[in-house]
Amino acid sequence: MARGLKKHLKRLNAPKHWMLDKLGGAFAPKPSSGPHKSRECLPLILIIRNRLKYALTYREVISILMQRHVLVDGKVRTDKTYPAGFMDVISIPKTGENYRLLYDTKGRFRLQSVKDEDAKFKLCKVRSVQFGQKGIPYLNTYDGRTIRYPDPIIKANDTIKIDLETNKIVDFIKFDVGNVVMVTGGRNTGRVGVIKNREKHKGSFETIHVEDALGHQFATRLGNVFTIGKGNKPWVSLPKGKGIKLSIIEEQRKRDAAAQAAANA
């Protein structure tokens, strides 16, 4: 018997980085089809209800969205399960707030508050550069955009800076040794560092060696790396901790120091 697409998602099967409590019900919101993969996105309902606390219930979220109060990348979105993903800009003009979705060092989405000027652009990783009919060049980005007539210097894995009002390329960052990157997949998700080395393996994955601000080195796959700035200066504001992953002992010491400071105060 033929079966169509599943329209539901069990809460225990939802991505861990959504941080849903087990006892909050049997089901979780299933992301709609969109620019990001279902396991690598955060539906709008979770942003409004669970993260920003602007709504208490599912119905309140629908009411807010239907009043066209929420914009993603400069466009009004009324779909409650629209999949917002890495680097997306969420704007709420009514409150004058803007947020950029980034990862913390534990691989969870963080809503990083940004200024109005920073909310006007977005960084996009280039997936491929191709030629269409009549030899027209175009590039594809990680979030499903297609942009025609890009600069010929731009290649796959580079990062482009897009003006969200005009949807045109303002600037770009080459994927080169010495540029700052953020890891978007694997066990090092959310870590920020500078590319030190690039290992090419024919017939296998390319390995990228990265060094963070404290001098710790780690390696990850090429597909997990997203260039976010030239040199060691990122073009976007980073979450608390600046993408530096602490060891378990370092985290404990940090908590103890904070508790001691609070006790003394």
From Swiss-Prot:
Ribosomal protein is among the record's keywords: yes
Biological process, per Gene Ontology: translation
Domain S4 RNA-binding: 42-104
Primary subcellular site in the record, as a coarse category: cytoplasm
GO molecular function terms attached to this record: RNA binding; rRNA binding; structural constituent of ribosome
GO cellular component labels: cytosolic small ribosomal subunit
Location relative to the cell: Cytoplasm
Keywords: Cytoplasm, Ribonucleoprotein, Ribosomal protein, RNA-binding, rRNA-binding
One Pfam family this sequence matches: 40S_S4_C
NCBIfam families in the record: PRK04313.1
Annotated HAMAP family: Ribosomal_eS4
Similarity comment: family membership: Belongs to the eukaryotic ribosomal protein eS4 family.
Designated name of the protein: Small ribosomal subunit protein eS4
Gene: RPS4
